[in-house]
Every structure is written in structure tokens, then in C-alpha cells.
């Protein structure tokens, strides 16, 4: 079986080339051709020795993910659905802005965490993506957008691991993919412009801080354990105190001096003044050292199976003001791509569920979710 070269970071590719009797500088050349120029045909790689190109043709390939569909929003957001085999498909979303281009990437086919407000969680979980399948989303999007815009300049300046899946539950594939994105011979992203979003897998947060510390976002969504247990089931394993301690440890190594807490605003569930006061006490405890953080309030994007509703704009604004008045930097996420189901929490793809999530979620829909003070 031939090797997919998208699976390798530069060190891995150098080791592979060494097995072929080649020096490291050949791996650098090959890496640049693949990631900077978007080449998948070894015959195009003109500065590689013909003998190496022939070797590669017999033992390696560059495997793009088949594109099932592409949708473009009225606001310019682009969503791609990629086929990852065995009846599974994952989604990636490009969000253009005046000063940046952000790509939201998936790390798993489905998700096993099962957050109540997330469409992906309702799809269940099939499998982890490989490093190559993670990188292939960036590889395709970057070079497809360059071709569309008629430019050789970099289009994607920021990558967020906020698509389908919990990245830190796919750690062994995640880290080589991050290293490829950061490598100056690859995509050359700054550690500050590469963000991993987690629902709070505490041991892997500690490992990432040592192995490949990039910007960190944490899906918080509740100010106390009782409510977070309902919204983010992983909280039952790693409760808030453990999670916040992990955030503090992570900041010792992080490229940014704050953690971004993501907070999906759910009408009547987690959006009341008391919840804001509890959040303030959580991250700014009286008499204790708090977590350096900012909050990103996310308007909920409804989907039929959730049984939940979006907080009204006035409630979101009042909630944000309470946090801001307490000295916490707070933003409200602008909804992008909701007309093509590309907004936060809407990515679902097509998942061959191996966790019976649909059955569990159907049972949960009969339970009235109530805020817990």
C-alpha cells in the first residue's frame, strides 16, 4: 500500500525519504511542493531528481479528499462536504473577512462528546480522521481558493479546529497535522493564528501544552457543574475546577496570554443574569487568582432535534455587558454562513454512527432541560 504524504509532518516526511535513501533537504523540497504549491503529481516537481520522482510514484501518493458538495453563502462563507469513506462525510468552512481568512476544520467523523446544542453530537461518532485527512481540508481549501481568486498569495491566515469532532480525543493525528500547519515549509501559520477548541479533555490539554502549544479555546457553555453536566456530558469526567486549573497550566506555555471561553447562548437555560454572575465568580474568584480569559458569546444556531432556542439579542447584549463591566473582555460572535448550515454548531456532515447517539438524543428530547442555579 502506498503512503499518503499528507499524513506526514516534515520530520515524518524526512524519515520516509531517508528510507528511500534520500537526504533531508529532499523532504523539504517535497514538503514545499505539496503544501505551498498544492502539487499532487510528482512529475510536476521539477527540482526533484528523476530517480526520486520514480521512487515516489511507486510507493507514495498525495490524497485529496473527494468533494461531495460546495455551498457559498450570501456573505461569502464557503462550506465543503468531503467524503472520508465508509459512508462518512465531514465539513470544512472558510470564513472571509477584511483582515483575515479563517478555515474551520473537522477532526473526527462525528463526535462522541454529545453536547446538547451541537448538531454534530446528534449525528453520533464513527471514527477519528487521520493526520492526512485533517491536513487535506486545509490543502484543498487553500489551493482551491487561490485558483478561484487568481492569486499565489496565501488566502487562509487562520485555522480553527472547531469543525466536527473533539480534536483532543484524536490527539495522535492532531499533533502532526498542527505541526504541518505551523511549519514554515508548509503553511507557515503563527501559533497565535492556529486555535484548538476543546470541550475540556484535561489530560490532553496538558499534553498539548508540552507538545505543540497553540491558541486554546474551551467550550464552556455553563457557569456551574450541575448545568454543564447536562449541556456538555464530558463535564462529568472533568468538572469545572479541574478544567479551569488545566487552563491556568496551559497558559504557562500558550502563545496567547488568555484562554477563549466559548459560550453558546440558550434561551432560558444559561443566559440569565445569575448565570453571568456565576461566570464572573468562576473566572474571577474573590480572594483568589482567576483565569486570564476572554468570552466569546455564540448565538445558538437551532436545528430540529435540539429542542433548544436562541437567546434574543437584547438578552445576549445584557449578558455581555455584565461580563464586560466585571473587567472580562467579551465579544459576541457574528453569525456567518447560517443560510448554508455552516454556522457554529450546525456542522453535521454525514456520519455512520457507531455510538447510537441518535437513540440517546431521542431519549433526551423527552427530558426538559432546566437551568440549575
Curated annotation (Swiss-Prot):
Residues 97-339 form the Radical SAM core domain. PROSITE patterns: RADICAL_SAM. The active site is at residues 91, 344. InterPro entries: Aldolase_TIM, Methyltransferase_A, RlmN_N, RNA_MTrfase_RlmN, rRNA_lsu_MTrfase_RlmN/Cfr, rSAM. The keyword Metal-binding applies. GO terms for cellular component: cytoplasm. It is an enzyme of class 2 (transferase). One of its GO terms (biological process) is tRNA methylation. S-adenosyl-L-methionine binds at residues 165-166, 197, 219-221, 301. Its EC number is 2.1.1.192. Pfam families: Radical_SAM, RlmN_N. Keywords: 4Fe-4S, Cytoplasm, Disulfide bond, Iron, Iron-sulfur, Metal-binding, Methyltransferase, rRNA processing, S-adenosyl-L-methionine, Transferase, tRNA processing. Binds 1 [4Fe-4S] cluster. The cluster is coordinated with 3 cysteines and an exchangeable S-adenosyl-L-methionine. It is found in: Cytoplasm. [4Fe-4S] cluster binds at residues 111, 115, 118. One of its GO terms (molecular function) is rRNA (adenine(2503)-C2-)-methyltransferase activity. Its main location: cytoplasm. Its cofactor is [4Fe-4S] cluster. Disulfide bonds join 104-344. It catalyses: adenosine(2503) in 23S rRNA + 2 reduced [2Fe-2S]-[ferredoxin] + 2 S-adenosyl-L-methionine = 2-methyladenosine(2503) in 23S rRNA + 5'-deoxyadenosine + L-methionine + 2 oxidized [2Fe-2S]-[ferredoxin] + S-adenosyl-L-homocysteine; adenosine(37) in tRNA + 2 reduced [2Fe-2S]-[ferredoxin] + 2 S-adenosyl-L-methionine = 2-methyladenosine(37) in tRNA + 5'-deoxyadenosine + L-methionine + 2 oxidized [2Fe-2S]-[ferredoxin] + S-adenosyl-L-homocysteine. Reaction proceeds by a ping-pong mechanism involving intermediate methylation of a conserved cysteine residue. Specifically methylates position 2 of adenine 2503 in 23S rRNA and position 2 of adenine 37 in tRNAs. m2A2503 modification seems to play a crucial role in the proofreading step occurring at the peptidyl transferase center and thus would serve to optimize ribosomal fidelity. Belongs to the radical SAM superfamily. RlmN family. This is Dual-specificity RNA methyltransferase RlmN.
